[in-house]
Amino acid sequence: MEGRGWPWKRKSSDKATTEKPVVGIESTPVCSLSYLASLENQEKCKNTNYVQITMDSYTHMSRMEDQVKLFEVQVKDLKEKLTLAHSEINTKESLILQHAKVAEEAVSGWEKADAETLALKRQLESVTLLKLTAEDRASHLDDALKECTRQIRIVKEESDKKLQDVILAKTSQWDKIKAELEGKIDELSEGLHRAASDNAALTRSLQERSEMIVRISEERSKAEADVEKLKTNLQLAEKEISYLKYDLHVASKEVEIRNEEKNMSLKSADIANKQHLEGVKKIAKLEAECHRLRGLLRKKLPGPAAMAQMKLEVEGLGHEFTDPRAQRNMSQNHNAHIAKAEISTDHKLEECKRENVYLTRRTLEMEEEIQTLKEHLSARNNELQVSRNVCAKTLGKLKILEGQMHMFNNDKNAPKSNSRNLSESLSSGHDHHYPPSVTSVSEDGFDEEGSSSECGPATSLDSHKVRKVSVNGSSKPRSSSRLELMDDFLEIEKLVGSDPDGANSASKSSNSVCSRRSVEKQSSSKSSEPDEDTTTLDQLLMVLRSRINRIFESQEGISIDKIVEAARFSIQEMQGSSTKRMSSHLFEVTDETLEKHVDIQNSEKEQKNTKQQDLEAAVANIHHFIKSTTKEATQLQDMNGNGQLRESLEDFSSSVSKYPTGESSLSDVMLELSRISVLASNLNNGALTLKPHSKEIPVTESNDKVTLLFEESDSNPLGDTFAKTDHCVDNLINGDDSSCKSLLKEVEQLKLEKENIAVELSRCLQNLESTKAWLEEKEQLISKLKSQLTSSEDLQSLAETQLKCVTESYKSLDLHAKELEAKVKSLEEETKRLEMAFTTEKHGHEETLAKCRDLQEKMQRNETCENCSSSKLQPNQEKDIVSATEKLAACQETIHLLSQQLQSLQPQSNHILKSRSPEKKFQQHKASEVTPNSALDDLPHVHIIQPSRSVKHTVNPTVHAIMKSSSVSSSSKEDNEKHTRGLGRFFSSKSKNSAR
């Protein structure tokens, strides 16, 4: 039993040695019995042998005999005791046999326990290896942790400083931005309220304008329908003109044939030259009259100043929208210190507001202009219509008067009447070739019967020319030759035939036809014999023409006096039937003209009153406008010490107040207004609110209105014409010859004026078309302005969306800052939690170290117990058995505990083996040179970390994860070999101690 160690402390290689002590234990009782028998035989041999001894020895022996006796007694006692001991030994041997069986069973159990202990030893070795590697790793990790904590502390201090600086800077910046944004938000809210009100007003105005545009479009559609009607009428008129041209061509051919037959080309050329000179004179007169009528029309229509002003306004509008940078630069230079503090959104909003205001002003001004132009057009159309109707009626009446006057004068002046009747017969005979024209259409597109007589001036001109020629022809001396008389008649025929060709315009030819139709209508309506008179007159004219032709053809050798007398006689024969009828028509026409003249005078008075009221209202509006626009300028002049503008304003207001009473005239008011405009233009500092783009237009418009009304009130051509007609009627009633001549002259003048008026009417129509085109351009401008309004509204909405985006971005920044604060708090909590976990892990490592030390102490105790048990012999066997059983139980408990610990440590070891990094392998390979004992001694010192540092410094979760993964990484093969060698040394030293 001496050489046997504890089975749980022995290696698998010591199994052979453990079997020998077991055999010794089984043979111990047999050896003890043989030893006792040998001792008894030796004592018997000693008693039989005798030896001679001395006295000393005998005495000594006697003494010894006593002692021997005593010893024999003792031996007997001992024998008895031996017998008792033998009996006891036998009983004990039986017990020993039983114990041997039990020991065999125990040995088998011990062997099983040995195998289990070997497995446990191996597991312990692996666990100790893992512990050693973990301790080495922990030491390295502690070093790394110290470095990391130091670096983290440094980084954290730097980051804390940076964070504090950044937080201070951001808080100050945030406060500034917040204050600025609050101010801007307030301003923008006010601007939005204003913009909302402006937008509401604009929407209302746009709705009104859209309604107005719808009305204008309806009117335009009506006008287009009227234009189509006019086109159809024009086509019909063109057809009539083509027919008339054909007739003219035929007539010209006939005239050429007659000229060739009579061989009078030289004389006709001279006469044509004379006519050309007269025509030049007439053209000069007509041009003068045209200039006069143009002046009158300029007074009625917008003048060239107003048209130029409108063109300038349109050009200024284009410049404003194409290049608004100048105004922006001026405003930026004026408000430089404010513009630096404003953001781009404010600039955009201000620009949008300015553009909106400007566009609204422009649209209002354009609407006012359009309304005024429409009013002017309607007024001019009405006036033209009235003048057309009146002129048509007067033309018809004058035509009838002319015919009656010719017939009336025939009785008194026979030769004159003969020649005049001849010319009229020729002209009327020529006129029958022309077909009647279609009724004309007025400017407004309405067909009227009265307007069909617009075309009268051409016929009046023809008759005037014929009459002049006839008068000239009749005034020649009777002593002229037959050739001169033929020249006169040829001249009459040329005038009758070539007048439409000389006019060279479709309007004059159609006018002649229309005037003839109007005269025929009025004469037919006024007379009781509608168609018979015209037929009889035509027959008489044809008969007269045939007789005159016969006279010229048959009487070639007769003198001129006889030819004239024959023609005169033939005319007098045919005259008697128509004198009575003409006189009746004359008195009817005079009554009608008087009534018409009275009506016209009443209407003129009413028009004058309305014009005077309009003038007073316009002057009052101008006065109010000038006062409102020159307040700031007067204040600035008062500050500068110059009060000229205030004085001129006072003079202007006094002249305006005196104007309704008649103390001051309209020219005085306009002079004062011009002075104010000059003073306003001299102000170069820009303080005057009469801005060029928004205020000049109404002033010029009002000035044009006032001047137009003033000129219209000063001139009235219709009144003059009707005064002339009144004078003519009075002269007709008197019945004097001189008055008749003057009346004829006046009638001729009226015809000329009427022709000029017709020309001016055509020009007015052209002007009307141009004004319509201008109105269309203005409508296009309004559409452009509306599109620009919509674009400005889009810009405003974009600016509002940008503002909303900015506010939302600031809100998101607030939320992001709050999230960052929450993240910082969560990171601090995580650092605290990681520190707590670190402390718990440290305590766990300390507990494992304490357990390892306890196991080492237990192993040492077991070794000492084995040494003690080997020194003792048989008496200590029972104690050894008892202690062995106790130790077995304790060993089983420890095995159970170790198995539990191994199960708890096994997943950690697997994780460590899996997640080992190559860097930590290299570090542990370097650290493998250190002994395990030193590592075990250093472990408690490694895990001591100052709590203040760990509390102060926050650990990044990524860093913590890296540290955790590095702490849990597995060891390499070299580390395993190193730790197996260390454990082999450790257990070999223990086995040596147990062998001792």
Swiss-Prot record:
Q: Name one Pfam family in it.
A: FPP
- Top-rank lineage group of the source organism: Eukaryota
Q: Which family does it belong to?
A: Belongs to the FPP family.
Where do the record's region annotations for Disordered lie? 1-20, 409-482, 496-534, 962-996
**Which keywords does the record carry?**
Coiled coil
* Bias kind Low complexity: ranges: 417-428, 503-527
Q: Which InterPro entries is this protein grouped with?
A: FPP_plant
Q: How does it assemble?
A: Interacts with WPP/MAF proteins.
Q: What is this protein called?
A: Filament-like plant protein 5
Q: Which residues form a coiled coil?
A: 59-94, 133-248, 280-301, 359-387, 601-622, 737-841, 876-906
Bias regions of kind Polar residues — which residues? 471-482
Q: Does the keyword NAD apply?
A: no
The encoding gene is FPP5
